[in-house]
Amino acid sequence: MAEKLNFDLVSPERLLFSGQVDMVVIPGSEGDMGIMAGHAPVMSTLRPGIIEVENEGAPRQRIFVRGGFAEVTPAGLTVLAEFTVPLADLDATALDREIALADKDVADAKNDDKRQSALEKLDHLKELRHTV
């Protein structure tokens, strides 16, 4: 039996998931990353996207995150997410609200760096909207 990964998914409101899994795919700022037990330590910011939790014998869990941070240590993976919702619960209306918030962030950006970051977030949300 393969070694399991300790995985914690935390939002500002609560601990959403804590357990041992086979693999987690996270939407890192530089691209998607598959994390398994024994992965090298790494920290990454998260872009809006889908976290996929894989566990042998169980359906794949897919969770939308609006951003946050991920840390891989020898103890496991911890994701601190700004906002999360299971993909099964995500509907077009909710995603449209997220897009509107991101659009406002673009308009309110105080400098070019913040505007670029907000535009990237908006682009990712629009891509996700096409999948719903």
From Swiss-Prot:
Signal peptide: none annotated. The gene is atpC. The keyword Ion transport applies. GO terms for molecular function: ATP binding; proton-transporting ATP synthase activity, rotational mechanism. Keywords: ATP synthesis, Cell inner membrane, Cell membrane, CF(1), Hydrogen ion transport, Ion transport, Membrane, Transport. Produces ATP from ADP in the presence of a proton gradient across the membrane. Belongs to the ATPase epsilon chain family. F-type ATPases have 2 components, CF(1) - the catalytic core - and CF(0) - the membrane proton channel. CF(1) has five subunits: alpha(3), beta(3), gamma(1), delta(1), epsilon(1). CF(0) has three main subunits: a, b and c. One of its GO terms (cellular component) is plasma membrane. It is a peripheral membrane protein. This is ATP synthase epsilon chain. It comes from Parvibaculum lavamentivorans (strain DS-1 / DSM 13023 / NCIMB 13966). It is found in: Cell inner membrane.
